[in-house]
Each structure stands twice: as C-alpha cells, then as structure tokens.
C-alpha cells in the first residue's frame, strides 16, 4: 500500500472532498427542483420574460412590460451613472475637505474635522435612508428654485431630470466617500516635508497656490493607492441603492 494511504491526513482530506461534492450535488438538486416548481428552468429564457416592475431612474426608455434583460441593462447603466458622478463629486469634496484640514484657518480645520468625524461614524445605509426620507422627500411638492428646480418629485438641473432616489444615493455616496478621501488627502499632505511649505511661503506664494503647485503633486504618490481603494468601495457601496 502506498505510503500516503497510511497517513491519517490523507483520509481526512478525502472525506472533506467527498463531503463538499455531496453538498454541491444536493444544492444543485434543490435549486433545480425549486426552479421547476416555480415554472422556471436552468436556461436563460427568463431573461426575455416581462420584468413586471418599475424603475424610478432610467437612462433609457423602460416600462414594466419590458424584459428582464432590458431591466438589467437599464439598471447597469444607472449604476454606471451614479458611480461615475460619485467618483467625480466625492474626489472634489474629499480633496477640498482634506486641504481644509491642513489649513492655517482654524474655522476651516474645525469644520472639515467635524464633517469627517461625524460622517465616518455613521453607517452608510443609515445615511442613505436619511437623505431619502428626511432630506429629499421633505422638499416641497411644487418645484422651487431658478436654474435648479427642487421638489420631492426630483431635481431638474441643466436639462437633467434626476429622481429623488438617484439624488439620495448619489448624495450619500459622495458625502460618505468624500470623508474618507479627505483623510487620505490630509495624510498625503502631512507626508510632504515641512520644508516644502516653508519654501513656497518664502517665495511669496499663497497657501492655495502653494498647495496646488508644490504640495499636492508631491503628495499624490502617497494618496493614489488608498484613493483607488475608496473608488472601489464607492462602486461596491452603490449596490445599497436597493434600500431606496
């Protein structure tokens, strides 16, 4: 008998593999039986059946009578839109808040610090529900505003009609991710030698100009890895839109 058959570890591993195969077979059998019981199958024919539900935000024309495949396509485009807009706005907010945390102005430091501390302590799902039920559904029934029209039916901006659901998800993602980006930017700025700050001040450059031209370019290598992680988190967190 080969040596490996005499080892107890081999038989333990064999039993584990057999158990996993049996569990997978049982799982597949249960799925097949339940799908047949509900009138579905293991094919993709269900994709062409009527979806039967409405979507609050649609980048393309959609009706409940359209197929599941079209509903998935429209939903994918909605996710892509909120992710791209969220990345742009969250980066802008995060860089501004991170720069403010490194400012000499005590008021700016306090405001940005309070924003980061508050937002990072509250779960994102709770923030999304707040923006939806309290902030946007609390808007007036009739549109108000000039260039931007606000109402609890949605927001109209530069020819774009955004539903309250989309605005709630976008605002929540931007505010939440922006707080994390602010901390990343602050850390990157603090990693730059203080001599660089003294150098641009000695040249008579303003704080803002020195930050943009001297400090931030040097802080970028330290910021990018963590910033990429936050971008991925924003994309994953966009799935919480199902809550609103």
Where are these regions (language model features)?
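Transmembrane alpha-helices and adjacent helix-loop boundaries
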Residues: 1-244
């Amino acid at each position: 008998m080969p040596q490996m058959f005499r080892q107890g570890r081999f038989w333990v591993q064999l039993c584990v593999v057999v158990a996993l195969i049996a569990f997978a077979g049982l799982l597949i059998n249960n799925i097949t039986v339940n799908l047949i019981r509900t009138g579905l199958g293991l094919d993709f024919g269900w994709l062409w059946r009527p979806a039967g539900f409405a979507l609050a935000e649609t980048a393309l024309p959609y009706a409940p009578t359209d197929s599941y495949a079209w509903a998935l396509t429209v939903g994918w485009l909605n996710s892509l839109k909120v992710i791209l807009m969220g990345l742009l706005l969250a980066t802008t907010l995060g860089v501004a808040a991170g720069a403010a945390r490194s400012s000499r102005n005590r008021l700016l430091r306090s405001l940005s610090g309070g924003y980061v501390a508050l937002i990072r302590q509250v779960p994102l799902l709770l923030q999304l529900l707040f923006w939806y039920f309290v902030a946007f559904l609390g808007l007036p029934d009739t549109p108000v505003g000039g260039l931007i029209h606000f109402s609890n039916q949605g927001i109209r901006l530069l020819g774009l009609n955004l539903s309250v659901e989309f605005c709630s998800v976008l605002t929540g993602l931007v505010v939440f991710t922006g707080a994390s980006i602010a901390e990343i930017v602050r850390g990157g700025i603090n990693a730059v030698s203080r001599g660089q700050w003294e150098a641009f001040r000695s040249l008579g450059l303003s704080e803002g100009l020195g930050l943009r031209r001297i400090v931030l370019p040097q802080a970028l290598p330290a910021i990018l890895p963590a910033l990429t992680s936050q971008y991925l988190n924003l994309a994953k967190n966009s799935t919480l839109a199902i809550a609103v």
